[in-house]
Swiss-Prot record:
Organism, scientific name: Chlorobium chlorochromatii (strain CaD3)
Subunit structure as annotated in this protein's UniProt entry: The glycine cleavage system is composed of four proteins: P, T, L and H. In this organism, the P 'protein' is a heterodimer of two subunits.
Any GO MF annotation of the entry: glycine dehydrogenase (decarboxylating) activity
NCBIfam families named among the record's database cross-references: PRK00451.1
Enzyme class: oxidoreductase
Coiled coil: none
The keyword Ribonucleoprotein is assigned to this record: no
Protein name as annotated: Probable glycine dehydrogenase (decarboxylating) subunit 1
GO biological process: one example: glycine decarboxylation via glycine cleavage system
Assigned keywords, A-Z: Oxidoreductase
InterPro entries: GcvPA, GDC-P_N, GDC_P, PyrdxlP-dep_Trfase, PyrdxlP-dep_Trfase_major, PyrdxlP-dep_Trfase_small
Amino acid sequence: MPFIATTESERTEMLQAIGVNSFDELIADIPYSVRLQRALELLPSLDEPQVRRLLERMAASNRCTAEYVSFLGGGAYDHFIPSAIKTIISRSEFYTAYTPYQAEVSQGTLQAIYEYQSLMCRLYGMDVANASMYDGATALAEAVLMAMNVTGRDQVVVAGKLHPHTTAVLKTYLEASGHQAIIQNALVDGRSDIAALKALVNQQVAAVVVQQPNFYGCLEEVEAIGAITHEQGAIFVVSADPLSLGVLAAPGSYGADIAVGEGQPLGSSQSFGGPYLGIFTVKQQLVRKIPGRLVGMTKDRDGEDGFILTLQTREQHIRREKATSNICSNQALNALQAAVYLSLLGKQGLQQVAAQSAQKAHYLANAIAALPGFSLKFTAPFFREFVVETPMPAAHLIEQMVEQRMFAGYDLATHGESGLLIAVTEQRTKEELDAFVAALSALKA
């Protein structure tokens, strides 16, 4: 489609309609120092073959996990995605569907979401799941706001190491809604200091939040954290890696009131950070406070099963000040990916993926710890991710390993800490793990 610019007279008419005399007056609130003071350096117009060649050259400069052995984690993991997933979600009835407002003509989409919700409830050991949130970080932030709404309290305690990006999103949500800042519990050996946590949690705390496994990969003492939370009448919020639940206990089994998670490991590609999937589940007593969409099963007038959007308490449906949340969309396609992934793998398949990831991670951790100059930063148990102290800056190590066609891990210096965060999935072979260790041992300081 060609771009047809507005004329000078049309621009003048639009400016007059909104009550300003010039474009500069329209953008007066934008500091002059941050405005571009030169003409845009645009390419000349290109035909389709030229555009294709240009984009292919640009794309060729990327380094991806199809060509490099990846040990990157920190929230996005290189798990295998069965080809059947793309085939199913690419069907036009799924791929083009948006909000199923008209239930009578959206039964297929609604049933797919209902099946996703059912799978999340089984996986997390909870009673109700919504149709999804934007991502794991926004799901956690919404969970905390929900806890504050339920309890009438204004503080949140973070037990253990929460992903820094999630912490940033949570702070943004709380500051924008006028709530108090986050209280961070102390850490011991990479996870929550239980004694310190007990002293922190009181009758002013709305929620205690824990990530399982935490950002460092360490497994938190979730049962003890849950007990401390409930002693003070607070809401226990768990952000659990869904794939880890193939081998770890479900949040519902150790008392989580709200359990959320980042659904990327369930069939979504890493995709340079998104789009991802926010999982949100609750216990039955909190169902009327749940944010986002919720699909329910009902009977039509002929007695046949049907699916509808139910308990719609978002700002689109009721007064904004009475709404449980102002979220106005969900990640239905990514939720479908997760449902297809779990359906294809089944219970045993998920257990095998989780077990292989854990076993290979521990094999690699032991091998790296035996190298001169390398050591594990924490002794706490972990799932498929761990932190290594290195004999050189992690950034330098990562740079050298890229030359060996390996992504060595995530540099914690990004967050002002020492160490290299390494993740291992079921995709890594023993040959790749051994080659990684050999490459590390040959590095130059």
